[in-house]
């Protein structure tokens, strides 16, 4: 391009010079023209022609003829010169084009060679498909090799399912990681060309995996109720029992290459990496069962709680996440492990017994005082419960309103209730409440009214739930930062941020907590008999008639409500089932399925808008002998399916429902799912039940793809039960030990052994290059010959690279002792477990300038 512009510039300069010369020549002709014109003017003005005039006329004709020939001659000359220049330019252009064509011919040959090499020689897999049939149309040799020589027109789904799934993704450039012949490949799909590109990403994925395995995890460990449980024992017995707990914990931690530090008597800090954390996850934290067995031995209510966080964050943030995790575990009742891993959903393990009550009169009084202080500072209080409001939610809302009204009798407290969001079974009771006491007495307002009244300094009280999605009016939370939460459900990771929370998962109900608070107020709280009946009904429903989560505190609160006028007969009438419901329940029970000889699963494709009906069905099934848990699965809307779960004894339906995006209590839980169907939900439920409770099944043989604690090493063939084996296979930690997989593993082992031999040969060669080499470091000495500062491994490796052009991994360099004086020191480099190279470091004094 530059050459072409330079040539054009030369041509323009020459053309300009020629034009200037022509103009100069024409300037001389201009003088002749002036003379001719003057002669004509003289002849015209001459009145007496003479002989001289005739001669002048003759001379003028000669001048005119000369001028014409001269003028046109110059024009012809100029035209010739211009034509000649144009011809030269054209020839130059033709020559340039010929040169370009020649160059392009040479380049095209090389480009063709390069393209052919890219397609056939470089380790880049290329697969062209027919987008309509999703069949392979062409693939290069490398792709053919790694895909095991598929035939043309083979369906892509038969070759690799992950590649087939990329076609339907909405990403701009869809990509995924696929495993072929024990190698990892990064697979890109170009939609406009219908072509796949495969790049070997084995090393990159190995580095990522290694980095992931070394990620730090911090665990906070606490013994629940340890101090309280040991009070009745003398000092020596306390030491013996506590020592048994600590020994069990220490024995459990020892195989995991971790660091355990006792902070206080019942609290510990554990440091480990992701690799060992994964082993704990596979083991499902058996320490929980061990601690539970020790407690059973001594008849103690002591359990273990752990909160684990594993993120690539600063130590401070990671410790905060770990602290939040153990707080969540204890809010959920203890006896469990909460694991928070980066980019993964929070996992829960354990919780096989009901929440242990940690509540005391002192604890209740402190919470009551904190709540009173907050209410005194915030005179405008807005109170709400969860959507599909039930009797416990309504009872707790009324109880909190009465507490707030006692502290601030100025009528600045409001109950937020939308009738359309009430549970259908509650509507008759709500209408009776309005008829008995009127909306004005209780200051009942709607969500729309509340949105116009709540200010930045107002207080919102959230009762009987901690989850924003479950709230009656979640949109109101953004109107003020002043939020308090009182609840008895086990906490989840999606709790509502609050300035104060009173959560006691061992309590029977939220009503129980609030009625206890009333006993610590300076003034007496006025509650009508009808309000007391609603609160009593809330406790009755949440405990299933005082069966679940019932303690002496529960009976104390129930007794107090009876004293306030609660009518048990009226409450019983509210809870009666109508005739049609009884028939429907019996019909559903007659069609139920008994799964694993202990779980009852009831399914219905009918739509039941009343969610409490599903709970009634599940509770009715529990009355059947040998049924440990019941799951009622049905639609509650066109595109929404609900499960109501109830259980006895050690069956924890809460953890099962949490795996299906729900939650609840140990023996009472539920979930709601959208965009699915009854069959899929049922299959998912069975899958989780099998994983958790399947035992004694026939064994299956599997090939381990990684080391698994207490099971075996990588590539080892072991026998496990079907449930655990399928779990390992699904998580890509094992393969079924069939002929095909055994052959693949055998070939892989051969390749790995070959790679190991090659690596050892390479390290032996590197050892020879390193051995007996010398480097020198000049350092500054103090007055007494001591070294200023410290010689680091980084300095040593950098100097070795500078002198010998060999890069050493600082982590593999070892010094026999710290360098504190000048001299010659041997430096070891551990290239492998078996190969060690040694060079010498000469430490000399830096000479002052």
Swiss-Prot record:
It is found in: Cell membrane. Signal peptide: none annotated. It is a multi-pass membrane protein. InterPro entries: DDH_dom, DHH_sf, DHHA1_dom, GdpP-like_PAS, GGDEF_dom, Oligoribo/pAp-PDE_c-di-AMP_PDE, Ribosomal_bL9/RNase_H1_N, Ribosomal_bL9_bac/chp. Residues 214-342 form the GGDEF domain. It comes from the Bacteria. Residues 681-849 are annotated as: Large ribosomal subunit protein bL9. The chain crosses the membrane at residues 11-31, 64-84. Its main location: membrane. GO terms for biological process: translation. Keywords: Cell membrane, Membrane, Ribonucleoprotein, Ribosomal protein, RNA-binding, rRNA-binding, Transmembrane, Transmembrane helix. Pfam families: DHH, DHHA1, GGDEF_GdpP, PAS_GdpP, Ribosomal_L9_C, Ribosomal_L9_N. One of its GO terms (molecular function) is rRNA binding. The large N-terminal domain has 2 potential transmembrane regions and a GGDEF domain. Binds to the 23S rRNA. Belongs to the bacterial ribosomal protein bL9 family. This is Membrane protein-large ribosomal subunit bL9 fusion protein. It comes from Aster yellows witches'-broom phytoplasma (strain AYWB). The gene is rplI.
């Amino acid at each position: 391009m530059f050459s072409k512009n330079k040539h054009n510039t030369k041509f323009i300069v020459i053309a300009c010079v020629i034009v200037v010369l022509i103009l100069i020549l024409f300037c001389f002709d201009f003088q002749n023209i002036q003379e001719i014109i003057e002669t004509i003017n003289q002849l015209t003005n001459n009145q007496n022609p003479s002989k001289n005039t005739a001669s002048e006329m003759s001379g003028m004709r000669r001048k005119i003829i000369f001028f014409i020939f001269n003028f046109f001659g110059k024009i012809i000359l100029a035209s010739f010169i211009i034509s000649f220049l144009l011809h030269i330019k054209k020839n130059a252009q033709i020559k340039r084009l010929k040169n370009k064509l020649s160059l392009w011919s040479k380049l095209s040959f090389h480009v063709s060679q390069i393209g052919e090499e890219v397609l056939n020689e470089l380790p880049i897999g290329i697969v062209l498909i027919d987008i309509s049939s999703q069949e392979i149309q062409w693939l290069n040799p490398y792709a053919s090799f790694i895909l095991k020589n598929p035939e043309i027109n083979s369906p892509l789904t038969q070759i690799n399912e992950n590649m087939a799934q990329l076609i339907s993704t909405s990403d701009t450039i869809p990509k995924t990681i696929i495993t072929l012949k024990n190698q990892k490949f990064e697979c890109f799909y170009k939609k406009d060309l219908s072509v796949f590109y495969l790049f070997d990403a084995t090393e990159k994925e190995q580095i990522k995996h290694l980095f992931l395995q070394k990620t730090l995890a911090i665990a906070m460990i606490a013994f629940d109720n340890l101090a309280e449980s040991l009070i009745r024992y003398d000092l020596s017995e306390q030491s013996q029992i506590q020592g048994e707990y600590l020994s069990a914990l220490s024995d459990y931690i020892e195989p995991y290459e971790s660091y355990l530090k006792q902070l206080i008597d019942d609290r510990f800090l554990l440091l480990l990496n992701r690799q060992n954390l994964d082993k704990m996850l596979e083991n499902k934290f058996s320490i929980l069962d061990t601690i539970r067995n020790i407690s059973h031995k001594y008849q103690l209510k002591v359990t273990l709680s752990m909160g684990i966080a594993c993120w690539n964050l600063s130590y401070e943030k990671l410790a905060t996440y770990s602290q939040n995790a153990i707080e969540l575990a204890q809010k959920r009742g203890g006896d469990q492990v909460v694991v928070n891993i980066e980019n993964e959903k929070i996992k829960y393990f354990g919780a096989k017994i009901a929440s242990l009550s940690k509540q005391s009169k002192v604890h209740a009084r402190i919470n009551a005082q904190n709540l009173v202080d907050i209410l005194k500072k915030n005179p405008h209080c807005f109170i709400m419960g969860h959507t599909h409001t039930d009797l416990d939610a309504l009872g707790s809302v009324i109880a909190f309103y009465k507490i707030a009204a006692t502290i601030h009798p100025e009528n600045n407290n409001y109950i937020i209730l939308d009738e359309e969001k009430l549970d259908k079974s509650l509507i008759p009771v709500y209408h009776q409440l309005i008829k008995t006491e009127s909306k004005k007495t209780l200051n009942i307002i709607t969500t729309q009214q509340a949105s116009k009244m709540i200010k930045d300094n107002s207080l919102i009280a959230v009762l009987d739930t901690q989850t924003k999605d479950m709230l009656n009016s979640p949109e109101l939370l953004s109107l003020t930062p002043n939020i308090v939460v009182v609840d008895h459900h086990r906490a989840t990771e999606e709790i509502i941020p609050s300035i104060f929370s009173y959560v006691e998962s061992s309590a029977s109900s939220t009503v129980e907590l609030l009625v206890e608070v009333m006993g610590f107020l300076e003034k007496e709280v006025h509650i009508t008999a009808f309000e007391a009946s609603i609160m009593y009904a809330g406790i009755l429903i949440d405990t299933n008639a005082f069966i679940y989560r019932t303690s002496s505190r529960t009976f104390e609160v129930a007794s107090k409500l009876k004293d306030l006028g609660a009518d048990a007969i009226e409450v019983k009438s509210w809870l009666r089932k109508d005739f049609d419901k009884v028939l429907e329940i019996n019909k559903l029970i007659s069609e139920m399925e008994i799964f694993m000889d202990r779980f009852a699963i009831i399914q219905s494709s009918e739509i039941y808008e009343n969610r409490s009906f599903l709970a009634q069905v599940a509770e009715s099934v529990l009355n059947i002998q040998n049924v440990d848990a019941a799951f009622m699965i049905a639609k509650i809307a066109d595109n929404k399916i609900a499960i109501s779960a109830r259980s006895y004894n050690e069956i924890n339906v809460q953890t099962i429902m949490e795996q299906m995006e729900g939650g609840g209590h140990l023996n009472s839980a539920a979930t709601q799912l959208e965009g699915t169907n009854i069959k899929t939900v049922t299959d998912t439920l069975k899958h989780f039940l099998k994983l958790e409770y399947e035992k004694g099944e026939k064994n299956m043989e599997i090939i381990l793809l990684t080391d698994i604690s207490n099971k075996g090493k990588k590539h080892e063939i072991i026998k496990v039960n079907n449930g655990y084996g399928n779990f390992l296979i699904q998580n890509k930690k094992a393969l079924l030990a069939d002929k095909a997989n055994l052959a693949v593993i055998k070939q892989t082992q051969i390749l790995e052994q070959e790679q190991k031999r090659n690596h050892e040969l390479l390290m032996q060669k590197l050892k020879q290059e390193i051995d007996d080499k010398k480097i020198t470091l000049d350092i500054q000495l103090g007055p007494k010959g001591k070294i200023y500062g410290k010689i680091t491994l980084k300095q040593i490796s950098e100097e070795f690279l500078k002198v010998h052009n060999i890069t050493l991994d600082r982590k593999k360099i070892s010094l026999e002792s710290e360098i504190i004086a000048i001299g010659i020191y041997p430096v070891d480099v551990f290239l492998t477990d078996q190969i060690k190279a040694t060079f010498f470091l000469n430490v000399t004094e830096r000479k002052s300038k």
